[in-house]
Amino acid sequence: MMGMKQLSIFTDGSCLGNPGPGGYGVVMKYKQHTKEIADGFLLTTNNRMELLAPIIALEALKVPCKIVLTSDSQYMRQGITQWIHGWKKKGWITSSKQPVKNVDLWKRLDLASKGHEIDWRWVKGHAGHVENERCDTLAREAAEAKPKQEDIGYQA
């Protein structure tokens, strides 16, 4: 599509205890502009926060964009680029005939991705990648801030 805005999104999730208090961090870059988003939850898991971070970033966009989305979560990246196709065909059941974990967030991420051209990239965590380190700090600080907000979809 001609004239799509091109931006970079970096995401990370954190959880103290897993399950426990958790948070996500997002850094969005468009031209010379940078926006940071973070929030925390009372009880959640690291995987839920790794999924929620790109959801929040993508839901913040008002128009279809060309995006390079970088995360240190193989779970999120493989899920959205590979596993989700089979899950949808099988009615959100895994290859081992179990319900897909975090299905509420996978459906939301799938929906939030629509209309965008996304290059899903993985980066090794805690390896000095500036934006990933910033996301990690945002996510950890949100988790450590004694969040009261409930992660509605989390099931212990």
From Swiss-Prot:
Where does the RNase H type-1 domain start and stop, copy by copy? 3-144
Q: What does this protein do?
A: Endonuclease that specifically degrades the RNA of RNA-DNA hybrids.
What organism, scientifically named, is this protein from?
A: Shewanella sediminis (strain HAW-EB3)
One CC-aspect GO term:
cytoplasm
Task: List the Gene Ontology MF annotations in alphabetical order.
Answer: magnesium ion binding; nucleic acid binding; RNA-DNA hybrid ribonuclease activity
* Keywords associated with the record: Cytoplasm, Endonuclease, Hydrolase, Magnesium, Metal-binding, Nuclease
In the record, biological process GO terms are: DNA replication, removal of RNA primer
Catalytic EC class? hydrolase
Q: How is the cofactor bound?
A: Binds 1 Mg(2+) ion per subunit. May bind a second metal ion at a regulatory site, or after substrate binding.
Entry's NCBIfam families?
PRK00203.1
User: Which InterPro entries does the entry mention?
Assistant: RNase_H, RNaseH-like_sf, RNaseH_domain, RNaseH_sf, RNaseHI
Gene3D superfamilies cross-referenced by the UniProt entry: Ribonuclease H-like superfamily/Ribonuclease H (3.30.420.10)
Cofactor(s) the protein requires to work: Mg(2+)
Q: Where in the cell is it found?
A: Cytoplasm
Q: What is its EC number?
A: 3.1.26.4
Give the matching HAMAP family: RNase_H
Q: Where does Mg(2+) 1 bind?
A: 12, 50, 72
> Which catalysed reactions does the entry list for this protein?
Endonucleolytic cleavage to 5'-phosphomonoester
The protein here is known as Ribonuclease H
Q: What does the subunit comment say?
A: Monomer.
Positions contributing to Mg(2+) 2 binding:
12, 136
The similarity comment for this entry is: Belongs to the RNase H family.
